[in-house]
Amino acid sequence: MELQLRDHTEGKLQPSQERLAEKALAQAAERLDVPEQAEMSLTFVLNPEIRELNRDYRGIDRATDVISFAIEDDDDLANLPAEIRAELPVELGDLVISIDKVTEQALFLNHSADRELGYLLVHGFLHLNGYDHEEPADEEKMFTLQEEILDGLGLSR
């Protein structure tokens, strides 16, 4: 999977956090059997930027921890021949994570910033791949998978 990583944190993002992001997303992609030609972006921001995105796209005027913008819509590709679809990159979408919220929530929840970052990465990635937690059965499925991936990264609760 191709990952485009952007850092809008004015120096707050640590190299170890970038490495964790790459590792967590690669492991999640492998677990979900995401095609190698899949593409996504990950942008790390500060609270003011994610607050603006949250307000503009979700109508909620406060900072949040992660926002997922899924791009791929299978309906758009359904009319193309299978051999052409197989050659096209799979556009998963964009994740935006507030590095400020990673720190705040890790302190509040009394666990490591790595655990919090891993959680947000995997949670957002699952949303990009069609998982949600609107219904109890879907929530159980998503959260179980999420914890299994985090356990595999050594980021257990």
Swiss-Prot record:
Organism in which the protein naturally occurs: Limosilactobacillus fermentum (strain NBRC 3956 / LMG 18251) (Lactobacillus fermentum)
Q: Which family does it belong to?
A: Belongs to the endoribonuclease YbeY family.
Protein role: Single strand-specific metallo-endoribonuclease involved in late-stage 70S ribosome quality control and in maturation of the 3' terminus of the 16S rRNA.
Q: Which domain of life is it from?
A: Bacteria
State the free-text cofactor note.
Binds 1 zinc ion.
The molecule here is called Endoribonuclease YbeY
InterPro entries under this entry? Answer: MetalPrtase_cat_dom_sf_prd, YbeY, YbeY_CS
The catalytic activity of this protein is classed by the Enzyme Commission as 3.1.-.-
Q: Which gene encodes it?
A: ybeY
- Any idea where this protein resides? Cytoplasm
